[in-house]
Design a protein with these regions (language model features):
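Extended catalytic cores of very large enzyme megasubunits
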Residues: 1-247
Length: 247
């Protein structure tokens, strides 16, 4: 590999894939990233231990062959806890109420999400009934699933006429706190709080009718803003669909 290519390769590696190791106050080296990835595969396929070790020694560490870079980034506990992290991209038409919760779950897992708000999809959504007069406290857990559940509970309250959730953010770690499982730093509760407020505002304005494509698009954008605030990848939107079918 030429020097210019090596420099570019190292920049991408240490910026996107190397975990910070608090005990020694530095990021992983390329060889350590490969060892973490190989160890995950060996735990999954112990009968192939020696073959995996040899492949990484002869091909992966010298960068002759590269595995899925998503698996290199999240190798270990993140993928073993939720294998959705190994996916690079996904697609989700907004044709059912829980699509919004699925989108935030995928985005927080590092998966790119393309979505469609074409009228033929959005027409499948139910009429927004609005929540009942009864409130209930919902404690948001400090996890990807916790954030996704908060969105799901809010949408369900408005589409199924359930009790109005009063969100409790006390368990979400403060901004800047270390994320142990996946690495990086926590965004704090504010991005999610803002997102839920924006979603609630749109839902309130559409009680008694179905959401329109532009409203669904706005909701997806508010969700992706919350995820971006945490330094995770964003949603994408197909340029050919910029003119929304908001009939």
């Amino acid at each position: 590999m030429e020097l210019s290519q090596q420099i570019l390769s190292d920049l991408v590696t240490f910026n996107k894939y190397a975990r910070f190791i608090p005990e020694i106050n530095r990021r992983e080296t390329w060889e350590e990233i490969c060892q973490r990835n190989a160890a995950m595969h060996i735990r999954k396929y112990p009968q192939l231990r020696e073959e995996i070790k040899q492949v990484y020694k002869d091909f992966v560490i010298p960068k002759k062959v590269l595995p899925s870079m998503r698996s290199m980034q999240f190798a270990g506990a993140p993928i073993e806890i939720s294998n959705v992290r190994i996916f690079n991209c996904s697609y989700n038409p907004i044709d059912h109420p829980f699509a919004f919760a699925e989108i935030i779950h995928l985005l927080l897992s590092g998966v790119g999400v393309g979505f469609s708000v074409r009228k033929k999809h959005v027409d499948n959504l139910p009429v927004i009934k609005g929540p009942t007069q009864k409130n209930r406290r919902f404690l948001i857990s400090d996890s990807i699933e916790g954030w996704a559940d908060a969105v799901k509970v809010l949408i369900k309250a408005y589409t199924a006429g359930k009790s109005d959730p009063v969100f409790d953010f006390r368990d979400i770690r403060p901004k800047g706190a270390m994320l142990v499982t996946a690495g990086g730093k926590a965004p704090g509760p504010d991005p999610l709080r803002i997102c839920l407020d924006q979603l609630r505002s749109i839902l309130n304005s559409s009680i008694g009718r179905k959401l329109t494509p532009i409203e669904c698009y706005d909701m997806c954008c508010h969700i992706s803003d919350a995820v971006l605030a945490g330094g995770i990848r964003r949603c994408c939107f197909e340029e050919s669909q910029v003119v929304l079918e908001d009939g």
